[in-house]
A protein has these predicted regions:
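Thiol-based oxidoreductase modules, predominantly thioredoxin-like and allied folds used
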Residues: 59-77, 173-190
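Non-catalytic, surface beta->alpha helical segment in thiol-disulfide oxidoreductase systems
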Residues: 94-125, 199, 204-246
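Short hydrophobic/charged patches on amphipathic alpha-helices used for structural packing
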Residues: 18, 79, 133, 189-192
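Terminal low-complexity, intrinsically disordered regions
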Residues: 161-163, 179, 196, 235, ...
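N-terminal leader/targeting and pre-domain segments
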Residues: 1-29, 110-141, 232-246
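Local sequence-structure signature of Cys/Sec-based thiol-disulfide redox active-site neighborhoods
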Residues: 7-62, 136-174
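Structural micro-motif
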Residues: 77-97, 194-206
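Acidic, low-complexity intrinsically disordered regions
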Residues: 5, 173, 197-199
Length: 246
C-alpha cells in the first residue's frame, strides 16, 4: 500500500501536543487494535502515532492521563476484546468501549479532531447544544455513523469531531445508541467504493449515504434521530459546508 500519510512528528509538534494535553482534566483510555505487520502494513504507523500521543499526555498521581491499551489480533487472549468492541478491521483506534472509533490510522489532518475528541472527553463536555443533548438522550435504536475521510482533507476533522461528540454525549447520558466510526478511505477503499465516495467528508448513517461535507449540528441531529427511528428514507442526502476531492 502506498504511504498516504506521515506519522512522524517533529519536536515543535510534540511540544504543541504536550501544551494542549496539559489541560486534560480526567484520564482517557484509548484502545488500539492491531495485527502483525505481515498482515497489516499500516499497523506499525498506527502504533507509532498513538504511542507518541499517549506519551505526550501529562502524568498525574503516577499515571499517564492517556492510557493506551494495545490488542493484537494474533494474540488469542486479545480476541475477546476484539469481539466485545465488535472490531473487525485493523488498525482501529477506539474509545468509550468502541462507541468512538477510527477505522484506519487517524493521521494527517485527522490528528486535530482526535486530540479535540480526547480533550472534550477528558473535560466531560461535548460542546453540543442543549436541544441536541436532549434528543441524544432518548434515541430508541443504534445509529452507526461512518464518516469517510482522508489524511489530507482539512474539513474532515470537523465532521469526525461532530459525530464523535454525538456518540460521547449519548454514552455520557447512559443511552449509548450512537457509534461514531471515522473511516480512513485509503486504508478502507472497499467502504469508500461501497458508498461511491468522490468527495470527503462523506457521512453514512446506518449504511445510507446522508451528507457530503461538514453538516450543521441542527441538521445532523435531525438525520441521526430519523436513522434511529428507521425513517431515514424520508429525508434526502444533503451537501453542506466544505468538502475535498478524494
Amino acid at each position: 500500500m502506498p504511504r498516504y500519510f506521515d506519522v512522524e512528528m517533529d519536536e515543535e509538534l510534540i511540544r504543541e501536543l504536550k501544551d494542549t494535553l496539559a489541560y486534560m482534566v480526567n484520564p482517557v483510555t484509548i484502545d488500539l487494535f492491531l495485527d502483525d505487520e505481515s498482515r497489516c502494513e499500516t499497523c506499525p504507523d498506527a502504533y507509532k502515532l498513538m504511542k507518541t500521543i499517549a506519551d505526550a499526555s501529562p502524568v498525574r498521581e503516577g499515571r499517564r492521563m492517556i492510557e493506551l491499551r494495545v490488542f493484537y489480533k494474533s494474540n488469542p487472549e486479545h480476541l475477546k476484546e476484539f469481539e466485545r468492541q465488535k472490531v473487525e478491521r485493523v488498525p482501529t483506534v477506539a474509545m468509550l468501549d468502541g462507541m468512538i472509533r477510527y477505522t484506519g490510522t487517524p493521521a494527517g489532518e485527522e490528528i486535530r479532531g482526535l486530540i479535540e475528541t480526547i480533550m472534550r472527553i477528558s473535560e466531560g463536555e461535548s460542546g453540543l447544544e442543549p436541544e441536541t443533548k436532549k434528543v441524544l438522550a432518548s434515541l430508541p435504536n443504534l445509529v452507526h455513523i461512518e464518516t469517510v475521510v482522508t489524511p489530507s482533507c482539512p474539513y474532515c476533522p470537523y465532521a469526525a469531531l461532530l459525530a464523535n461528540m454525538f456518540a460521547y454525549e449519548a454514552w455520557k447520558q447512559g443511552n449509548p445508541k450512537v457509534l461514531s466510526d471515522t473511516v480512513e478511505a485509503y486504508e478502507n477503499m472497499d467502504i469508500a467504493e461501497k458508498y461511491g465516495v468522490m468527495s470527503v467528508p462523506a457521512i453514512a448513517l446506518n449504511g445510507v449515504m446522508s451528507f457530503i461535507g461538514v453538516p450543521y449540528e441542527e441538521d445532523f441531529i435531525v438525520y441521526v434521530k430519523s436513522a434511529s427511528e428507521g425513517k431515514l428514507e424520508e429525508l434526502v442526502p444533503k451537501t453542506e459546508g466544505e468538502a475535498s476531492g478524494l
